[in-house]
Regions:
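Iron-sulfur-associated redox domains of electron-transfer enzymes in respiratory
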Residues: 1-119
Length: 119
């Protein structure tokens, strides 16, 4: 059996600071009376721990609704190579994690989607 660890509430701000040392931290943030969205956070007080569902699921970080794949320059096709930033996505629900695992299988097996894999 795996050990279980608990983070006391008073230690969470220091934990968040440590996560920020790894990259930009995204977490559920209240955007209206009943709506939440994953946004970059700087302080623990910005995080909506009560969020049940966000407007867009965390898959938006791996498979955005729109993106540039190729561009043209003087009749030549150029593949667009955006360098992804390192992100920490906090507050992802288990069902979303399971969905991301399925997306990994789809986009990494067979002919891999290089844009997805890079993220």
């Amino acid at each position: 059996m795996q050990p279980v660890y608990f983070l006391p509430k008073e230690n969470f701000p220091a934990f968040l600071e440590a996560l920020k040392g790894l990259g930009r931290v995204y977490a559920p943030v209240k955007v209206s009376k009943q709506s939440y969205s994953f946004k970059a956070v700087e302080k623990a007080s910005e995080i909506a721990f009560e969020a049940l569902r966000t407007i867009l699921p965390p898959k938006k970080f791996f498979y955005p609704p729109s993106e540039t794949l190729i561009s043209y320059d003087d009749g030549r096709i150029l593949e667009y190579q955006e360098e992804p930033e390192f992100k920490v996505i906090f507050g992802v629900h288990p069902c979303d994690l399971a969905g991301l695992g399925i997306m990994d299988t789809i986009f990494e097996d067979g002919p891999a989607d290089s844009h997805y894999v890079r993220r």
